Amino acid sequence: EIRQPNGELHIPHIATAARELLDAGVRQRVVIHCPEGAWGEAPDLPGVWIPSQYLAQEEIVGSVGAGDAFCAGFLYGCHERWSLTDSVRLAHACARASLLCANAIDGAKTLAELKAEMVDA
């Protein structure tokens, strides 16, 4: 379970799941994400928790495409050989942009705009 009975995240369980995926044969990077943040790990790097920027429920306009936006941002960072942490930060920025719009298209921003939204952990 990634959540404790009180609803809070159980980050050690998330870390264990990521390590199990690596041990099962994932050769590059594993990222497990949820609204609060993402755990990232690679065979040659220790795991790290990278929190997302908080959005109040009333700020969220729509959630269609937010998970896909997260994945797209992460994959872009990987393709461009960004660090694991920066790839996840870009993924968070992409998901946040999507959540602030009513549909999956209006949240699309330029890379420069997304970089400005990347939050240091």
Indicate where each model-derived feature is located.
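Conserved phosphate-binding/catalytic region of the ribokinase-like
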Residues: I2-A121
